Every structure is written in C-alpha cells, then in structure tokens.
C-alpha cells in the first residue's frame, strides 16, 4: 500500500464461486457451514445465500455481522463445537446466538487510507495527520463505527484498552485474537506490552493474525485490532 499511487479495490465473491465450492463439498458427502463477512459491509453474504438455495439441509450460511479477526474467532469457535460432536444444525444455532457477544475493536495509525477510500475528506485527513490523531473503531451490529479519537499512539493505545475494559470481560474459554496490518507488528507488540493486564495468563502466548487485504486496504498499515467473546 505504501508503494502504491492508487488504492487497491475490493469486490464481493460471486454466487458462482460459492456454488462450485458447495457442489464439490456436498458431492463428497460433506455438510457445509459458511461464515461470511458482515452483510452490512459486503454483498458476499448474499452471494453465499443465493448459491445455497439449491442445497437445503446441506449448506448453512451464517452472517458473522463482523469482519477480519472478529469473523475469524467465530469460525474457530465453530470448529471447537464440531470437535465436541455437535451437528451442523446445532453449531449454526450456537453461532447465531454467540456472534452477538463478539467485540472487535481497532486502533488506526493513519487517516491517509480512509481519505484515499473517500471515507473522510482530505481536509480532515490533513488536520488529523498534523495533530497525530489516531482513530479507534469497532464493529457494532455489523457496521464499522468510530468509538473515538486520540492524539498520539500512546493515547490511542490507552483509549483502546479502556474500551476493552468497558466490555464484560474476555471469555478465555472461547477463541480470541489480536491482529495488525502492514509488514511489521512493532505497534502491536507495543500495544500488547501496554495491555498485558487484560490478557492474564495468556499475555506471553497471544494468538496473533494479520488483518487481511480487504480491511487492510481501507485502514492502511500500522493498525492494531483485538477480537474476543464477552462473558
């Protein structure tokens, strides 16, 4: 992204791509659970549902109402339930209920890519850059909202920590994850050091993932995110 003059574009997955995958799995005797990015952020969920119409009882689509690592931990939870011996229908029922307990929050390092994507004006981006403004965002009811803004990375990190503390506590019996964008996890490691008290006995072995191209395109490098189930 840093080396690109133009911002890459993102697009949804077509029904035909889903149908090809469904047919292959069902023909092999498998039952399929599809967990998608929030339907409020992408048309991919609708594509998955359209393709599933001919596979009733064999393909189940779950709208995660989330994205990136928030979507990831819902999938990981589904795999936990499968190992416990639940049927596909039972897993889907639990995921539909538990997805509302996921908190996904992030700290952005720059406003530049929100400007390039047309989500904020060049003037706002310029002023924010001059003042070292760091936005803190979250996925709420399937949409990305601004929780607040902080001046400087340290204040931004503290803001994110306070927002996590406001939640009902991390349920460590379920999957959780920290993530970052860019080629370096330096900012994430600083955040982990500052927020070590939040992760209790897991601080030295935290699951970490990159946030992926779709979200990374919109937020730019240097973003830090957390996703967890509340108690």
Describe the predicted segments one by one.
Residues 1-13:
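N-terminal glycine-rich anion-binding loop in soluble enzyme alpha/beta folds
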Residues 17-45:
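N-terminal glycine-rich phosphate/adenylate-binding segment common to multiple enzyme folds
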Residues 12-16, 174:
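Short coil/turn segments at secondary-structure boundaries
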